[in-house]
């Protein structure tokens, strides 16, 4: 019997320990890089003009720039995100009521309780409610990340994805990015601002003891969920 209680307590502790980790769904899912498929070399046919290989296999026209246009090409994203928002709300409600009741004659069975032959009854009620709320948020994210073209859309836009990992002491920082780039917005130095990327997904997370110290413990989260006040 004692062994059963010990096993039950151990299972309960393990279950609560499992609640200590809060899984976070990543914004950028799937592979964070892409590479062109290997093409077979053309067979010489003896003609003067041979069929050239595609651009992403080494061939580059003389008068064309080096902007990405094929799967596997790289592009540098300049992260320039400044987001600020504020919200204020207030509400006031007030209600007053007054009722007066009087009777010239008091029932016999109430004379001993309230005395006299005349009964006066006054009732007053007052309710007042006031509430205010406000929220402010200001986020700034600056940096650079080089991404890879992993998909070509039918209208010529490029779907890009990339990841950067930075290991600092005992923690690792991850920067993930994905979005749709219009080739016309790419600069001559092969960069584009994140403000000009459609459907942008920017994720900056980390792991290690510093990141764990910023999370609330499982016991604190338990009491926070069940506390009625």
UniProtKB/Swiss-Prot annotation:
The keyword Membrane applies. GO terms for cellular component: bacterial-type flagellum basal body, distal rod, L ring; cell outer membrane. InterPro entries: Flag_Lring. It is a lipid-anchor. GO terms for molecular function: cytoskeletal motor activity. A lipid is attached at residue 19 (N-palmitoyl cysteine). It is found in: Cell outer membrane; Bacterial flagellum basal body. It comes from the Bacteria. Pfam families: FlgH. GO terms for biological process: bacterial-type flagellum-dependent cell motility. Keywords: Bacterial flagellum, Cell outer membrane, Lipoprotein, Membrane, Palmitate, Signal. The basal body constitutes a major portion of the flagellar organelle and consists of four rings (L,P,S, and M) mounted on a central rod. Belongs to the FlgH family. This is Flagellar L-ring protein. It comes from Photorhabdus laumondii subsp. laumondii (strain DSM 15139 / CIP 105565 / TT01).
């Amino acid at each position: 019997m004692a062994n059963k209680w010990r096993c039950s307590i151990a299972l309960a502790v393990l279950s609560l320990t499992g609640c200590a980790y809060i899984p976070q769904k990543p914004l950028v899912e799937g592979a964070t890089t892409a590479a062109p498929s290997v093409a077979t070399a053309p067979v010489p046919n003896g003609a003067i003009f041979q069929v050239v290989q595609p651009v992403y296999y080494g061939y580059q026209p003389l008068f064309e720039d080096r902007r990405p246009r094929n799967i596997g090409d790289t592009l540098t994203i300049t992260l320039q995100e400044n987001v600020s928002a504020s919200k204020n709300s207030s509400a006031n409600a007030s209600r007053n009521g007054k009722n007066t009741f009087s009777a010239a004659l008091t029932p016999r069975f109430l004379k001993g309780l309230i005395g006299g032959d005349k009964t006066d009854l006054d009732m007053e009620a007052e309710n007042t409610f006031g509430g205010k709320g406000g929220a402010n948020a200001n986020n700034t994210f600056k940096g650079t990340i080089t991404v890879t073209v992993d998909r070509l859309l039918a209208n010529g836009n490029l779907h890009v994805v990339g990841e950067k990992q930075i290991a600092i002491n005992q923690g690792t920082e991850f920067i993930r990015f994905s979005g749709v780039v219009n080739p016309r917005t790419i600069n001559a130095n092969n960069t584009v601002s994140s403000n000009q990327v459609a459907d942008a997904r920017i994720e900056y997370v980390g792991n290690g003891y510093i990141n764990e110290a910023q999370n609330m413990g499982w016991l604190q989260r338990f009491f926070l969920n069940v506390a009625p006040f």
